[in-house]
Amino acid sequence: MSEITIGVLSLQGDFEPHINHFIKLQIPSLNIIQVRNVHDLGLCDGLVIPGGESTTVRRCCAYENDTLYNALVHFIHVLKKPIWGTCAGCILLSKNVENIKLYSNFGNKFSFGGLDITICRNFYGSQNDSFICSLNIISDSSAFKKDLTAACIRAPYIREILSDEVKVLATFSHESYGPNIIAAVEQNNCLGTVFHPELLPHTAFQQYFYEKVKNYKYS
């Protein structure tokens, strides 16, 4: 089997723990690289956009007339390569970001798109309102056999699903906001999680994304 290269966007945010979690999979044919420019992106079979600060990441993609932003849009919508956004990364993959004009001047070009959802940033409050929850896995993928938990840090909230193509992979309950809160979604080549899977010991979502990239490359 030829090498599979998964990139982790390394402009800002929690990229090193993501890299370490993929290394934990111990797959000899898997190559993990940091992505900081268009050249790096061109080496990737799949890409992870980690948690961090979505407006900061978007500003980092704006240099040289949106060169990296445009390359990422091409990666997602033209090449249709697998991409996974966690927390802030999920925000950047969302079609609609609520009240984004209050936070940035990018307008309709704030997010890359790919997930037909409406999302709300920092829904649960500040850093002090972060929490760990149990996931209710809806997917039948073998990657998700074990009981899984999720770390939600200034997590976004998926307000609405806008297309039948969007599949819910996992939900959780919150004492203040009720049950069946969407934790993970998938639409074609795009995967989104509102939590930080790289901050807990399990590698289930890294395994799931690796399988997604492998299926893309060898389909």
UniProtKB/Swiss-Prot annotation:
EC number: 4.3.3.6, 3.5.1.2
UniProt GO BP: pyridoxal phosphate biosynthetic process; pyridoxine metabolic process; response to singlet oxygen; vitamin B6 biosynthetic process
Keyword annotations from UniProtKB, A to Z: Cytoplasm, Glutamine amidotransferase, Hydrolase, Lyase, Pyridoxal phosphate
Annotated localization: Cytoplasm
Main location: cytoplasm
A molecular function GO annotation: glutaminase activity
CDD domains linked: GATase1_PB
Disulphide-bonded residues: none
Keyword flag Glycosyltransferase: no
Swiss-Prot/TrEMBL catalytic activity: aldehydo-D-ribose 5-phosphate + D-glyceraldehyde 3-phosphate + L-glutamine = pyridoxal 5'-phosphate + L-glutamate + phosphate + 3 H2O + H(+); L-glutamine + H2O = L-glutamate + NH4(+)
Record-linked Pfam families: SNO
Consequence the record notes for mutating R154W: No glutaminase activity
GO CC annotation: cytosol; glutaminase complex
Pathway(s) where this gene product acts: Cofactor biosynthesis; pyridoxal 5'-phosphate biosynthesis
Subunit structure: In the presence of Pdx1, forms a dodecamer of heterodimers. Only shows activity in the heterodimer.
Function field: Catalyzes the hydrolysis of glutamine to glutamate and ammonia as part of the biosynthesis of pyridoxal 5'-phosphate. The resulting ammonia molecule is channeled to the active site of Pdx1.
PANTHER family assigned to the protein according to its UniProt record, in alphabetical order: PYRIDOXAL 5'-PHOSPHATE SYNTHASE SUBUNIT SNO (PTHR31559), PYRIDOXAL 5'-PHOSPHATE SYNTHASE SUBUNIT SNO1-RELATED (PTHR31559:SF0)
Name of the protein in its database record: Pyridoxal 5'-phosphate synthase subunit PDX2
Gene name, Swiss-Prot/TrEMBL: PDX2
